[in-house]
Amino acid sequence: MNLLCCCCCSNMAPNQRVTRKWELFAGRNKFYCDGLLMSAPHTGVFYLTCILITGTSALFFAFDCPFLADSINPAIPIVGAVLYFFTMSSLLRTTFTDPGVIPRASNDEAAYIEKQIEVPNSLNSPTYRPPPRTKEVLVKGQTVKLKYCFTCKIFRPPRASHCSLCDNCVDRFDHHCPWVGNCVGKRNYRFFYLFLVSLAFLAVFIFSCSVTHLVLLMKKEHEVFNVIKAAPFTVIVVFICFFSIWSVIGLAGFHTYLTTSDQTTNEDLKGSFSSKGGPRTQNPYSRGNICLNCCHILCGPMTPSLIDRRGIATDEFIQQMQHQSSPRHALSDVLSASHMVTTSQPMMGGLGGGGIGGAGGGISIGGAELKPRFYDESNPSSSTLEGNGGAINGHGNGHGNGFDHPPPSYDLVQNGNSNSLAQLVDNEIPLVQMDIPAYTHQTATQARQYRHRHHKQRQICNGGTVSYENQLANASSEDELDDPDVVVVGSPEVVAAVAAIASNKAREMRNRSGSYSNLFDADFEAALVNSSLADNHVRGEGASSSGKPSAGAALLAAAISGKTENMYSNVLPVDNDTDPADSTLHVYSNIIDERKQQEQANNVLSSTLLCDDLDLDDPVSASCHVKRKSLGDGAEQVKSAERLRMLHDNTMIDTALDLDSLDGSSMGNNSQSCLVKSGKPNATSVTTNVAIV
């Protein structure tokens, strides 16, 4: 006999583990008992509900039922047990029952649906519109829209909705209830309603019985403290039931209304069949009778589950579910080969002779191997921004450079429409390539600094017109760094200069009023002028032994005075012959044109108001207009100061001007007339209108 058993066992196939479909389910639901039971992914509140109901009932059965059975009726414990049984069975059935999950479309079904909603030759049509994602069906003569679910790749049936917590489309979706730990839908709504009703009855029953117990004790003890000492757990049960009974009864009443009208919580909140969202529409799903609606919802046939949870997963099904759970992009192989580190900061890859720097990922394609790029948020001036670090350089056979942008400033976050210069620098999106030739600094400190492009505008007086020349130096050697338009500064100095510019802009906005303070132009450049800077050459990072001010100090001082402008890292130079309306220009390249127009308008307005308001006897008006020069024009500034002193001594400006005859309108915001004698003859920028008698 034993030999026969051994032979039979040897002929049997080896035991292989069978994969069920619930193990590969695409949603977030939890499954128990080999797929027989399912619930929501988060069931912590459900366990709290069970503890509250079970604990309160246990206290009632242990301390109240014996006294009430002897004093009133022995059937009280039986009624309480029946209500507790109905409540817990309805709760468990609601939690572990499939609410009506609609299975997702397979790959072939999704492709077929996409083909149906696709518009032929849509990309070539000038009136192209995205394909519609809704369908219309008739339900009892009323049009109902079917919405397309992008997650499940299906057109949802009427009254269905997608639960974001469970990540499934549920038929006749009512709501997601964390107290029961599951969605409430078509297949478990009846159990949910029975749970609410039975819980309401149980709470009312326990509360009334506990209060009765306390009242009977009061008749014997005649003191509240003695009653509390005699039945402390009864007092706890009364408090729990008192604070929970109102919400339970209200929720049960609300769902009774929904059941009698054949509506869902989702439809009631949206006002689909009420006058909340407009004219009242008739509910096409109602049977027209309260009893029929209740019988259909609570006593109607229960539809089978649409998901085959315990079915055996075939190889085709496994491949399909793996494809749905982890879709791959067309460039996923390229991205994985580059081992890139993605950041949330915008980046720009340079375009060189044979390479293209990818935006955001640091991929260089065309002649060079794939290379990662990084952004060092902790140290913007670190060596990863310079030279051979490869942090911002996405290069092929040529030189291609990119810029990493730091996180947006607080001013940008708080005021998105702010016009401050700090926001423009932070909000600047690199649209073009800027070639920064490699330059090896001699010290380690200089190697950790990057070149900041400081665009200076040279103003040339040509018959009253102002022409601007923006120069961008592409230094390729140490000798070419003598260009006055290229300043090598450190990152902290740039940040300080930008902050000073922002403060200066805010101060100008506050000073725009009709006060006399707007008539003066306190020019701060005189403090920065040195006789050793006559050739307007700025060299090095710090002050040299000869006493030359550092480029960072000059930049910061000019920023504080409000004379520094166009401090952008990649703003293209704008010439006079460039059309300002050209759409290919940089987004900030029209700032110079606006400033030019504003300054010309100010000059015209100032001279006009002065000539109209001065009450002089046949004066010969003359205007001495000295334009602002650069920092290095020391000789011109001295000449201008001497001319002003000579003009003051010869023409008696103080007695010739009748300040009382000036109209108040000349004190406007745009007036820049200097009508008071300047105390500093060496001012670098003076705009004065005089009348020679």
From Swiss-Prot:
Domain DHHC: residue ranges: 147-197
Enzyme Commission number(s) from the entry: 2.3.1.225
Keywords: Acyltransferase, Cell membrane, Endoplasmic reticulum, Lipoprotein, Membrane, Palmitate, Transferase, Transmembrane, Transmembrane helix
Residues at the active site: C177
Family annotation (InterPro entries): Palmitoyltrfase_DHHC (IPR001594), PFA4/ZDH16/20/ERF2-like (IPR039859)
Membrane protein topology class: Multi-pass membrane protein
Principal subcellular localisation of the protein: endoplasmic reticulum
Cellular component annotations (GO), alphabetically ordered: apical cortex; apical plasma membrane; endoplasmic reticulum; endoplasmic reticulum membrane; Golgi apparatus
Function comment: Palmitoylates Dlish which is required for the apical cell cortex localization, total cellular level and full activity of dachs.
The family this protein is said to belong to: Belongs to the DHHC palmitoyltransferase family. ERF2/ZDHHC9 subfamily.
Protein name: Palmitoyltransferase app
Organism listed in the record: Drosophila melanogaster (Fruit fly)
